[in-house]
Amino acid sequence: MARILITSALPYINGVKHLGNLAGSMLPADVYARFQRLRGHDVLYVCATDEHGTPAELAADAAGMDVRAYCDEQHDIQKRSGEGFSLSYDYFGRTSNAPNIRLTQHFAQVLEEKGLIAERVEEQVFSIDDDRFLPDRYVEGTCPHCGFERARGDQCDNCGRLLEPTDLKEPYSKISGSKNLEVRETKHLHLVQTQMETKIRDWVDASTEWPSLAKSIAYKWLDEGLRDRSITRDLKWGVPVAQDGTPREGFEGKVFYVWFDAPIGYIGATVEWAEAGGGDWESWWRTDKGADDVTYVQFMGKDNVAFHTVSFPATILGSEEPWKTVDKLKAFNWLTWYGGKFSTSEKRGVFMDQALDILPGDYWRWYLTANAPEGSDAAFTWEHFQGLINSDLANVLGNFVNRITKYTVSKFDGTLPSAGTPGENEAWMAAELDQRLPALVANMEAMEFRKAAAEVRAIWAAGNEYLTKAEPWVKYKSDVDAAAVGVRTGLNLVALFGILAQPFIPEAASKILDALGVPDDRRSWEFDGPASALLDALPHGMAITPPAVLFAKIEDAQVAEWTERFGGAPEA
């Protein structure tokens, strides 16, 4: 039994996340976690809300709330949204909680002891009208690299380049809109990444289980040359700059930069899990305490890759303490919305709470996995969503389950028949499974989720083709035993389809397996023997209860309604 630690990029606290956030980190991490649990492995999947920094302060101000109260509210909302999509976190923590604060201050102290933290005076944008410094997203303006007119002071949303507020052209205050700005000196702590460049490059070179997207982004940063980066900000909300509980002299009004403390939040959330009775957190994170046998897998969108392959490793490796580093990193491209990006700040696209108002979570889980933005960006359109759901879930899966279970009730008194001997059609179905099940498992292990979903769809389609070949409803008229073979095989396929569906559409999978009375200990992904055994695994004579309709078709009128509500194109 392997031990697998899974983290997904922390969802930021400034509002409900959109479907692009879900598709690029939390959902694939959950699919993978469920798969590995079904394979019998010891899995710990942790996540947390990322709560510090300027966006939290700005969002709280806009809501007219205290920032702590705002974060409390938003954490609960995001937790409920995750539950609505059946995200199976072992723990969902918060970066504003005590464990992350302690760990962030610990890492800063250790890095300074190693000579990797330096106090420096730098120039920052100051708003005369607001009487304050404008770090990060408190200032916006024109990107000096691509000309995007709404670039933020920390990063351009259009080209993805990291920025400093002083880099922006025609800057203005996000608080007041004032352009009455000047550059003033302020003192901050810097992480001396230039001293870590060789060590980080060697570590990236040795990381063999990353997709090309992640590797290319890491090397791009390294090839451009690492810069020493400020890790503190002139803000009130964040991890205080302190050592052993004592504020650092001259830094009383400053906090650590959110991108310094946020990745440490993976560890902090695991500490929270342990404190809540989960277990020993150090055995998952400290290689001197048992984590040397852990496989650590990270999931994130491509905009987070540089921070996870360069900045966070600089913290971990620079400490020279025995911390577990990532083994496998799965990075995703964008899920696009009619040619543009989903955007939290622009309120563009469909958000998780809105999606759940429209349809249950399984509809979205399947679509976002089958359409995962892996090799390239993936486009969301209502028409594509409708077509995929109706074809895969309502027709190929739902119709199969409905047809064979109801026929069993109609012609075999609702019990699994035992008569008849398998023949050519059953051998064909077994051969399909012998070919496709190993491919499915291999794709899941490789975290190739589109390919995995395609294999599941192909297995469902093969089941439908089998019923067309077997024709139990035709054979019943002249050879009940031959019909019984088709029904028995079909019902075993229903059970197998439910087992295979668990990582992707867990609620529907449970309905299928519960209807067949499949016990929990028979729901694992164990396909080591010949597939023919899977086609006769259910007890003969068992009672069959057809499940309720699993997936309703999406009608054209619904697509028209949703297009009207959410739009079919990004804002200009």
Swiss-Prot record:
Subcellular location: Cytoplasm
InterPro entries in the cross-refs: Anticodon_Met, Met-tRNA_ligase_1, Met-tRNA_synth, Methionyl/Leucyl_tRNA_Synth, MetRS_core, MetRS_Zn, Rossmann-like_a/b/a_fold, tRNAsynth_Ia_anticodon-bd
GO MF, one example: metal ion binding
Residue positions of motif 'HIGH' region: 11-21
Pfam entry (one): tRNA-synt_1g
Positions annotated to bind Zn(2+): C143, C146, C156, C159
Positions occupied by motif 'KMSKS' region: 341-345
PANTHER family named among the record's database cross-references: METHIONINE--TRNA LIGASE (PTHR45765), METHIONINE--TRNA LIGASE, CYTOPLASMIC (PTHR45765:SF1)
Protein name stated in the entry: Methionine--tRNA ligase
Organism: Maricaulis maris (strain MCS10) (Caulobacter maris)
